[in-house]
Amino acid sequence: MFPMVTEFMNYGQQTIRAARYIGQGFMITLSHANRLPVTIQYPYEKLITSERFRGRIHFEFDKCIACEVCVRVCPIDLPVVDWKLETDIRKKRLLNYSIDFGICIFCGHCVEYCPTNCLSMTEEYELSTYDRHELNYNQIALGRLPMSIIDDYTIRTILNLPEIKT
């Protein structure tokens, strides 16, 4: 008779323990219910990128002196710089500048080490295409200024600032 009573006690303790675990899980679920949503509806809502965001590279053709520092500091030797030496003034003249964003790792070394600041990072990150050859941008495509997300009236922008708890 005693083994039956102890088994019944163990069953009761296990039932209480299981109910407590379920209650703890339910309390965690309820604590998450009053939080703001983490996800956004992407094509219609966009997050405002941070100031140091490394997006598409913007290139200013007139500032470039064809020194090829960007090619030397690039970990994958990506920028293609074509230039011609002008013998009468003994300076390089830039003919063509291109970057293939299908290969670029967006490290920002080219922007950081450029002596004339002709390269800069933009907030543009939508570079997807159906053909990978379209990701090879020449100096004309690199010189195009991106449309700011804030200026686009069709998109609702969401400021992503972390909450500071005090």
From Swiss-Prot:
Keyword NADP: yes
Subcellular location: Plastid, Chloroplast thylakoid membrane
Binding site for [4Fe-4S] cluster 2: 74, 104, 107, 110
Example GO BP: photosynthesis, light reaction
Key words of the record: 4Fe-4S, Chloroplast, Iron, Iron-sulfur, Membrane, Metal-binding, NAD, NADP, Plastid, Plastoquinone, Quinone, Repeat, Thylakoid, Translocase
Any one GO CC term of the record: chloroplast thylakoid membrane
GO molecular function term, any single one: quinone binding
Keyword presence, Ligase: no
Pfam families for this protein: Fer4_9 (PF13187)
Family matches, as PROSITE patterns: 4FE4S_FER_1, 4FE4S_FER_2
Domain 4Fe-4S ferredoxin-type: 55-84, 95-124
Primary residence: plastid
Catalytic activity: a plastoquinone + NADH + (n+1) H(+)(in) = a plastoquinol + NAD(+) + n H(+)(out); a plastoquinone + NADPH + (n+1) H(+)(in) = a plastoquinol + NADP(+) + n H(+)(out)
Membrane topology (UniProt): Peripheral membrane protein
InterPro entries: 4Fe4S_Fe-S-bd (IPR017896), 4Fe4S_Fe_S_CS (IPR017900), NADH_quinone_OxRdtase_chainI (IPR010226), NDHI (IPR004497)
Cofactor(s) for this UniProt protein: [4Fe-4S] cluster
Binding site for [4Fe-4S] cluster 1: 64, 67, 70, 114
Note on cofactor: Binds 2 [4Fe-4S] clusters per subunit.
UniProt-listed Enzyme Commission number(s): 7.1.1.-
Function: NDH shuttles electrons from NAD(P)H:plastoquinone, via FMN and iron-sulfur (Fe-S) centers, to quinones in the photosynthetic chain and possibly in a chloroplast respiratory chain. The immediate electron acceptor for the enzyme in this species is believed to be plastoquinone. Couples the redox reaction to proton translocation, and thus conserves the redox energy in a proton gradient.
HAMAP family, per database record: NDH1_NuoI
Record-stated family: Belongs to the complex I 23 kDa subunit family.
Subunit architecture: NDH is composed of at least 16 different subunits, 5 of which are encoded in the nucleus.
Protein name: NAD(P)H-quinone oxidoreductase subunit I, chloroplastic
